Regions:
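Alpha-helical transmembrane segments of multi-pass membrane proteins
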Residues: 60-64, 106-114, 118
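Short, small-residue-biased leader/transition segments that mark boundaries at the very start
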Residues: 1-3, 162
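Multi-pass membrane catalytic core of lipid/isoprenoid biosynthesis enzymes
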Residues: 7-53, 128-160
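Membrane-embedded alpha-helices of multi-pass transport/permease systems
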Residues: 48, 112-124, 128-131
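Single, functionally critical "micro-switch" positions that shape active/binding sites
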Residues: 22, 72, 114, 121, ...
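Cysteine-centered, disulfide-bonded loop motifs in secreted/extracellular proteins
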Residues: 4-6, 83
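Intramembrane alpha-helical segments
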Residues: 15-102
Length: 162
């Protein structure tokens, strides 16, 4: 629903909110509905899992603004997208152990890699409007950065036999 930037990027300006097909109040209503359904599911789990799930909302809430603050918004995306690894352990084991943390960090590295690739399609528009990303940060050296992030992901995931 942060449409200011979406309306200024070629790839995203035709999305429903920037294109005017869905209003911000309609999107907020849908968000509230989804949040209530998610909360109903979350409350079925143990207390530790509920707290872990609620904690994820901080990262989810700040992510859309990170591209204005840091060259590393893909890290914050990785923290958010990979949170499910922590949730799985929280639900099943009632806690988070070293295996969960290794899975989490390995998944974050994987997300940084694929979202860096994805961000390259918007790099020109992003530069014009001041949006930061690892794609812009790495530029021509992206392939070397991807070797590092995907290499780290493979190493970490292999340590836990995934």
């Amino acid at each position: 629903m942060c449409i200011r930037d979406s309306a200024r990027v070629e790839r995203t300006r035709s999305r429903p909110i920037p294109a005017g097909q869905v209003s911000v109040p309609q999107a907020l209503a849908f968000l509230v509905l989804q949040a209530l359904i998610g909360l109903a599911v979350l409350l079925q789990f143990n207390r530790f899992a509920v707290v872990t799930g609620i904690a994820s909302l901080i990262i989810v809430a700040v992510y859309p603004f990170m591209k204005r603050v840091t060259w590393w918004p893909q890290v914050v995306l990785g923290l958010a997208f990979s949170w499910g690894a922590l949730m799985g352990f929280a639900v099943i084991l009632g806690g988070i152990d070293l295996t969960a943390l290794v899975l989490y960090v390995g998944s974050i590295a994987w997300v940084i890699g694929y979202d860096t690739i994805y961000a390259h399609q918007d790099a020109e528009d992003d530069a014009l409007i001041g949006i930061k990303s690892t794609a812009r940060l790495f530029g021509a050296a992206t392939h070397r950065a991807l070797v590092v992030f995907y290499g780290l992901a493979v190493i970490l995931l292999s340590l836990i036999h995934i």
